[in-house]
């Protein structure tokens, strides 16, 4: 992508059609789990923020699509992610085998709970 995307729609418009279909499904699952989350572009990726904090991101690479829920969810849901290529904070998957919506929702809800706990802790310190 030569120009920086201004929105997730703009980001998706520049992704190849096969990967776009997988990422649209991923976006829908994220939105269903976090309807109050704000869409944005962060570090060149399609991302979501909730209550001012990073929630999750996703993107397309040359040979795969990727979902970025952060390190903790990848570790906690390791057994459910065994069929995917993972590394700290990243889940890679082929465009023709998108992540199941139920698993995405579970990961997003875990991140929402993490952010909520962090926000409560931050509030107590003030």
Each model region followed by its residue ranges:
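Charge-dense, helix-prone N-terminal extensions
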Residues: 1-126
């Amino acid at each position: 992508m030569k120009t920086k995307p201004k929105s997730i729609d703009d980001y998706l418009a520049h992704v190849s059609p096969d990967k776009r279909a997988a990422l649209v499904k991923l976006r829908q699952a994220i939105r269903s789990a976090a309807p109050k989350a704000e869409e944005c572009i962060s570090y060149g990726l399609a991302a979501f923020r909730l209550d001012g904090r990073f929630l999750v991101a996703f993107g397309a690479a040359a040979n795969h699509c990727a979902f970025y829920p952060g390190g903790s969810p990848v570790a906690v849901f390791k057994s459910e992610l065994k069929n995917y290529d993972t590394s700290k904070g990243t889940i890679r998957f082929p465009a023709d085998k998108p992540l199941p919506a139920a698993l995405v929702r579970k990961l997003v809800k875990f991140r929402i709970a993490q952010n909520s706990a962090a926000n409560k802790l931050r509030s107590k310190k003030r």
